[in-house]
Amino acid sequence: MRVIGITGGIGAGKSAVLDFLQRNYKARIIQADLVGHHLMEPGNATYYPIVEQFGSQILNGDMTINRQKLGAIVREDFGKWEQLNRIVHPRVKEYVVNEIKAAEEAGMDYLFVEAALLIEDHYDAICDELWYIYAGEALRRERLKKVRGYTEEKISQIFERQLKDEEFRKHCRVVIDNSGDLEDTFRQIRKEL
């Protein structure tokens, strides 16, 4: 089984790539963000450490973590963003390692793990290779405004904290250019697999 890490800047089209991989290959797909959200649910691995670190003001009435409130706190303070990452990311990675074992036992051909901090969190140690899903900054900004309704200010804040193109290219064996139409993107993927 090949374990492939998928990364790229926000708005690059990683979700479209993952959808294609899920539909066309015998593969297990893991999205680190979704795992992180699951781990934040009451009783799960990161719930109590996050509440302890950020206080009860991040909780909804039903005691679940309000991710919008938490997000607003960490967007405003880089130190708090780093604190949150120190709580969440090691536990997400532990989950991924366990899922790799399970996928191997299930006879999967591929396991794709998508994570924003794939490079920073050293997923190269557990992946056979890393892929960078690329789209230019102007196109990504346009997608984020249109699809997610993000403001320029919010987009700039997010971009500021993400790796630059040259860093992604330095660490990833494969670059999939997702600037054109999706058929071209899918053709590049088929060539690699």
Task: Label the predicted regions.
Residues 37-108:
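ATP-dependent small-molecule kinase phosphotransfer cores
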Residues 12:
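ATP-binding Walker
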Residues 98-110, 124-129, 133, 137-150, ...:
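NTP-dependent small-molecule kinase module
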Residues 9:
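P-loop (Walker A) phosphate-binding loop of NTP-binding proteins
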Residues 15:
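Walker A/P-loop
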Residues 6:
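Hydrophobic anchor at the beta1->P-loop junction of P-loop NTPases
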